[in-house]
Amino acid sequence: FFFLRCNQQHHVLGVENSDNSSLNHVAFHVEDLDAMMRRIGVMSNAGYEPLWGPGRHGPGDNCFCYFEGPDSFVLEFTSELIEVPDGEEWTPKEWIPGPENANVWGTGGRTEKAASLSVPIA
């Protein structure tokens, strides 16, 4: 698993080895944690409960919350992603997926459904 960036955000795209070609989810970056919590409220009021979150990822140090949309596609709301200013020295780190860094807060347990949802790329 590795992250790619094309601007100052820590990551814009995550790529992982898989047995099938698929797009796991799309993330919508919002201005701050309060805005993310408001989006969670809007989704919950519309009948959508979180698949995973709210929480905070280790890589990127961003807050997150994942939902399944009406077409079973996974949507993420995220805020507070680390920014790496142009010209600033940055040392890449190895990230080994696990519960201790996937959600450093230890809240909003990931459901089995969250792990299984993906949309094949045609």
Task: Describe the role of every protein-language-model region.
Residues 1-10:
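Core segments of cupin and vicinal oxygen chelate
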Residues 13-16:
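Amphipathic N-proximal alpha-helical interface segments
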Residues 20:
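Long C-terminal interaction/binding lobes of large macromolecular proteins
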Residues 24:
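Long, contiguous binding/interaction regions
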Residues 28-75, 79-122:
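Vicinal oxygen chelate
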